[in-house]
């Protein structure tokens, strides 16, 4: 890989984005393949059956946007925001993700991918999705509210996470990865601290499947370039085919960041920061992988990180294999209370705070 270049081959410009109109019906339904979303909810339809698909009918006891009271905005992104909302009757809190559709086909594809995965996934280690709607150019997704925020929020409060707590966090994330990798054949492709959410019950859940990839089989490979550059595996950055082992690399970086309190890749000593994202990703591809300092951490943790961040993905362990690692099991008999830790760390979001 050439210094300062993101890919070893000449960059190919993507085709011009197509109009958003290809995703909309005259009745105001957002569609992509078998997926249909409108003001009444979401459904998947059979494309093999002749004729128009049946209308979307609201389910009994279905959540609706009219039932929700907006409390405050708890997250912002380039295409929308996440609001804390409360059900007017039950007083239960939810997170409402509101996305403004634009004219880019890639945005529409990402939204439909997230909706499709949310609709079909049932796992206690993934953030639950309760309902989705499309109306007046907005996609609204009602999600489980994780009142502790994200691991990124936790790190801002505590600086570093001790090994016993990190082991418990790791076990929960690995169980989520086992589900998406082996049961659903999904590569997350954007695993990072801000996409791992926590709550006062000590739960840790994976969220944000907007750039995920659904494979045809567990042995299939992907080749598209999406996600957050710093947490990308070397094979993804270099444009090679990749598998769900790319998520394992990202997990290793996340855990090492939580343990040390800083991102594993640091700029050269004479620099205060990376001059560009290209310099950083070049270092990820060209330099030796990061490691946990053996004088600061247990042999079990150092071994676990090493098995996650092997440069060759064939040398990385799978999520199932890592669940059997000594680091994941070494604190099982100890009094590791994630619920108390998350609460004592002061990371909980006060729902009604100004």
Swiss-Prot record:
Catalytic activity: L-seryl-[protein] + ATP = O-phospho-L-seryl-[protein] + ADP + H(+); L-threonyl-[protein] + ATP = O-phospho-L-threonyl-[protein] + ADP + H(+); L-tyrosyl-[protein] + ATP = O-phospho-L-tyrosyl-[protein] + ADP + H(+)
Main enzyme class: transferase
Consequence when changing residue 220 to E: Increases kinase activity in vitro
PTM comment text: Phosphorylation at Thr-218 and Ser-224 by MAP kinase kinase kinases positively regulates kinase activity.
Top-level taxon of origin: Eukaryota
E.C. code: 2.7.12.2
Residues at which ATP binds: 74-82, 97
PROSITE patterns reported in the protein's UniProt record: PROTEIN_KINASE_ATP, PROTEIN_KINASE_DOM, PROTEIN_KINASE_ST
Domain Protein kinase: start-end pairs: 68-328
Ways its activity is controlled: Activated through serine and threonine phosphorylation in response to wounding, cold, drought, salt stresses, abscisic acid (ABA), hydrogen peroxide, bacterial flagellin and laminarin beta-glucan.
Similarity section: Belongs to the protein kinase superfamily. STE Ser/Thr protein kinase family. MAP kinase kinase subfamily.
Name this polypeptide is given: Mitogen-activated protein kinase kinase 1
Native organism: Arabidopsis thaliana (Mouse-ear cress)
Designated gene of the protein: MKK1
